[in-house]
Design a protein with these regions (language model features):
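Alpha-helical oligomerization segments
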Residues: 155-212
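Long amphipathic alpha-helical segments with strong coiled-coil/leucine-zipper propensity
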Residues: 48-131
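Leu/Val/Ala/Ile-rich N-terminal alpha-helices, chiefly Sec-type signal peptides and the beginnings
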Residues: 2-75
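Amphipathic protein-protein interaction modules
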Residues: 116, 134-174
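Short amphipathic alpha-helical segments that mediate assembly, nucleic-acid/protein binding
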Residues: 13-16, 29, 66-67, 81, ...
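Residue-level detector of alpha-helical secondary structure
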Residues: 33, 64, 68-71, 85, ...
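Extended alpha-helical scaffolding modules
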Residues: 13-25, 30, 36, 109, ...
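Short alpha-helical "patches" and their helix-cap loops
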Residues: 127-143, 207-210
Length: 212
């Protein structure tokens, strides 16, 4: 009897703990859009980067960190693969659906394009089928014609999955193209943001019932 109870208790402890954690919601997205609408995207005199560009980078970091928190908790055994995918879907629906009207339409459209690699890489990581030879992958990606979007994204997502798994990328591969980056370079820039986010989440974990 006691042995059976111990086995049941042990099995229960082995199950991923369920969390009441809000990773990203529509209100958070809307607040960022409102802030960006009020920002000035023209650099002040003597400045190279405008207030709006700085905010846009922080916006990207916020989304990237929120998404990778989900994956990090999966790595910690807090979520099953199915739960992780469902939570990624929820955030992706907010981030990748629709565009604001006016001046921000093109800016947010470009942001959404760069964030394609974030969500695709996370799913590839969860599937577990990805190459870890970063150097070879970058070389392959840079050789793909920009019109071949799907193939380029597949390679970039492979790099991103390797980064989520612990590989380091991609500062040394983007420094030469930072002034005029192509789409694959934009994805490498986002993967660099992912790399930094994963480092910051090295000790991240949440207890059941905690919220953001």
């Amino acid at each position: 009897m006691c042995t059976d109870m111990a086995k049941k208790a042990s099995a229960k402890q082995a199950e991923p703990m369920k969390l009441f954690y809000i990773f990203y919601n529509q209100e958070r997205w809307d607040n960022w859009i409102k802030t960006l609408e009020e920002a000035n995207f023209e650099p002040a005199e003597g400045e190279e980067v405008s207030e709006g560009e700085q905010m846009l980078f922080s916006f990207t970091e916020d989304i990237t960190l929120s998404v990778l928190k989900i994956v990090r908790l999966y790595q910690n055994g807090r979520f099953t693969k199915e739960e992780t995918i469902a939570k990624l879907d929820d955030v992706e629906l907010i981030v990748m659906t629709g565009l604001p009207e006016g001046d921000l339409e093109e800016i947010i459209g470009s942001l959404q394009l760069s964030l394609l690699v974030l969500f695709t890489a996370c799913r590839k990581y969860l599937d577990g089928e990805f190459d870890k030879d970063i150097k070879a992958l970058v070389k392959k990606g840079k050789g793909i014609d920009e019109e071949n979007l799907e193939e380029a994204l597949e390679v970039a997502a492979n790099i991103g999955a390797a980064v989520v798994d612990g590989a380091t990328c991609c500062a040394k591969y983007i420094k030469d193209n930072v002034e005029d980056p192509g789409l694959f370079d934009e994805w490498l820039i986002e993967i660099e943001t992912m790399s930094n986010a994963m480092k910051s989440l090295a000790k991240f974990d949440e207890e059941p019932g905690e919220s953001s």
